[in-house]
UniProtKB/Swiss-Prot annotation:
Protein name: Centromere protein P
Organism this protein belongs to: Danio rerio (Zebrafish)
Family of this protein: Belongs to the CENP-P/CTF19 family.
Coiled coil: 1-80
Compartments, record wording: Nucleus; Chromosome, Centromere
Pfam families tied to this protein: CENP-P
Amino acid sequence: MEQKYEEDIQKLQQEIEMLEAEQEETLRSIFVQHGDRLQQGVKSACEERGGGGAQQHAVSKLITEVRELEKDLRRQTEINGITLNECFVKTLHKSERKLVQQLRLAGHCGLLLFQVEFAVTEIQEDNVLHRRVTELNIVVDGVEFKDFSAFVSRVEDTKDLLLFFRTLRTFSERCEDRRQTFQHFQEKYPDVVNLPEGCRSEIMIIRSPQLPGISMTLFWKIHVSKEGVVKPLLDLLLKMPDQALELDTKKVMEKGSDYFQSLLQLLGVEASIEGLIRAVCS
């Protein structure tokens, strides 16, 4: 009977520790999401109550801690380009040797919105701490996701969370490069450049106002390898009426894509697109 009581007491102690850990994690999450409002609320309460020296010191210390948390978050955002809007942590199991936590992170990297849910298991063996991700689910929202979906699926299978965040920033930067380039040429040549799916898509159509039926379609995909290597892939499709094709004795239309690839290597992306547009306008 005594042994049973000891076991019950031990279980209660473990539950208390888990609840305390959850409380601490909840407060940390609240600071992440509502730091500004908390800081203002604490200031208002202090001003209304007047408070003694000890109370004011405690409030001042709390405000300082909130500010430090905010500075750390801003610093991390500047370093990795990722902004977190939500951070939730829940302890599922806690003992002397093992800790299991469920986490949910939501935010954005550039124009890409993401939500990541994962479980982390920590096991203490002698003086060595083993930590691994045991579950992983990733949701990325944006028109660019079709270029990213295969990579995300593989990351979910391998549970390589660090690879996902490293690749997310590079992928987001390449998407932004494409968006800015497309938008630039559409604004510069509104009568020639058409973006049927918007400036965040992978397609640009170049049409000549003087030569109906002749067009160039630029495909700008962003490929992500299974190792997380991000590489832009550009291709060109030329189109003209059948009658004009019969006069194309030099096979310009047939070899147009190869010519464009050579142009990319020599001049780069923006100068190559500029050359295509000027050729159509001339």
